[in-house]
């Protein structure tokens, strides 16, 4: 299985335990810096899966950062519709509903049940640093513009 970025893995022993249970790939938590990722699953001595294969490290590399999930659909709520009778109004808002600060600065985007960053995260120029940290996969999240 793939260990997603919302599973709180912040240490090598925790990652090794998930690998023992069958994880083959780890998507690092969004807030972890590359040096921490490299310490948890170093490229020169990676955690191995239950089949003695190096566990693959992946990071979120492009798009709005998924910050939180809710049982409520914010898009349906915005349009005063019940969640189960929304008619997929989210399709009309491909990048979600932008929330701004009181100063008018973009803050968050509400996209269905997800709260996302308003700004797009982009690691395109960081290929060398990613490789040095042992990252072998980059997760991309599409958006309607500039992708």
Question: How should these model regions be labeled?
Answer:
Residues 1-13, 17, 21, 27-147:
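Active-site pocket-lining/capping segments in soluble small-molecule metabolic enzymes
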């Amino acid at each position: 299985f793939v260990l997603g970025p919302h599973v709180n893995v912040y240490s090598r022993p925790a990652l090794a335990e998930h690998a023992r249970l069958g994880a083959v790939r780890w998507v690092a938590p969004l807030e972890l810096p590359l040096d921490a990722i490299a310490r948890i699953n170093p490229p020169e001595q990676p955690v191995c899966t239950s089949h003695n294969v190096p566990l693959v490290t992946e990071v979120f590399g492009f798009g709005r950062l998924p910050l939180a999930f809710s049982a409520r659909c914010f898009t349906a709520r915005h349009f005063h519709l019940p969640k189960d009778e929304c008619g997929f109004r989210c399709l009309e808002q491909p990048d979600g509903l932008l929330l701004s600060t009181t100063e008018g600065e973009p803050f968050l985007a509400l996209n269905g049940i997800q709260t996302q960053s308003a700004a797009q995260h982009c690691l395109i120029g960081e290929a060398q640093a990613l490789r040095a940290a042992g990252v072998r996969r980059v997760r991309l999240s599409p958006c309607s513009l500039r992708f």
